[in-house]
Amino acid sequence: MSVASLGSRLVPRADTALVAALRADLEAADLTVVAVEDLLGPVAAAALHREQPVAALRATAPDHAGTGPLPTLVRHLLLGAAVDRGALDRALPRLGTAGAERLGLVAAAGRGADDAVRPLIDLRPYAARDAAGAVGWWLASDLGETATGAALPADHVLGVG
């Protein structure tokens, strides 16, 4: 995807190579419902379902969870926390921060490894099981109140749940 402007809104456009790189990175990081709940633990996961992110932020802090791809992506994409460019580049080795910017997923403060990158969307895993078997996917939505600290606008795109 690339991003075009439509008035004050950013409008994503498909770029299949970048989307494929994102998918490969999310799969390699194991950004799944089960892995996220295992990383957070039952208390932080339950709190996050109640829109209380403090325990999840602590569980994904680099000094607690390390700097691997999964804690970085959970902290950034699910919790809406800014991370440094170097950490995001390591978490998304195929897509990189530059590719995530082109997809309209993030906004970087600069090009340096220590420059902050903030998420522009909420991207989280979902899973279901039916007669055909288990399936997992990721769903993008606008950042919620937990990430923005502000009331939702009228044109807010909700996530699921």
Task: Tell me what each language-model feature is.
Residues 1-10, 14, 21-48, 53, ...:
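S-adenosylmethionine-dependent methyltransferases
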Residues 16, 23-117:
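Accessory substrate-recognition/RNA-binding modules or partner subunits associated with SAM-dependent
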Residues 84-160:
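Non-catalytic substrate-recognition/targeting regions of SAM-dependent transferases
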